[in-house]
């Protein structure tokens, strides 16, 4: 199989459009959503490798920072956490894995009207976020997967740092190739990356063996606190600001916890509610099968995918808990569960 044949037919037009568009940009800020996960960091790194191969000036913008457990990924250039003291004034923005401007963070969202922008994402919505072009593919498992297809459409080999970046995105957004989005296309791409030297086992090892003691203590406390609702079909856990302070853990240490709740026997949907600040709570939802947590999140001005979604509730914890669980209950009722 020729590398270009790895691009599925339904993705070919978008990959070719974005590859052509990237040849016409310069002085680019590459950004994704705030508090980036593995797919966001992997997609940004992949974009940086592509832009470097195309001899374009760029820098990565990450807010508030690259999470500690993802810091093993070599980045193509410096990751800036602010738009002050930049190496150049950007003219373009490449927006990745981010369905709406507010999820870029206030600093970049405020600057966005001044820039030409391209948007590549696999979340529903955000189709018009890029002023100069959009490629939104909800059928893709990860935005890093789309960046791999852009690279192939541009005639670039998937090797070295580019391959590792794509591998990170695939591994994290497919749950280590366990989720329902692990399609034949994903497995073909992953196999090609391994053939080209990507250390898939090494990426998994770094992701799975990078816990701090504070994270272990936090998870232990939350495991004791987690509750089952609706006859055991819903798992729920609240996280208060004091929990992070007491254990010395960071917000990023919660990454993956809601997936653990979803693995409880009989659970069809899991909800994690985190107090982010007084009067402001973040929620993460996970589900299996036909349970559409994206619909529950959308009812609360959030978003995501059918089996993984989230959002923000600007209210205190007691009200947020009731609001979130009621929205989830309505979705489960519609499924007859």
Question: Model regions: which residues?
Answer:
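Generic enzyme active-site microenvironment
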Residues: 31, 35, 95, 119-120, ...
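Short glycine/serine/threonine-rich phosphate/pyrophosphate-binding segments
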Residues: 38-44, 101-105
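Glycine-rich, phosphate-binding/catalytic loops in enzymes
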Residues: 46-48, 110-113, 136, 188
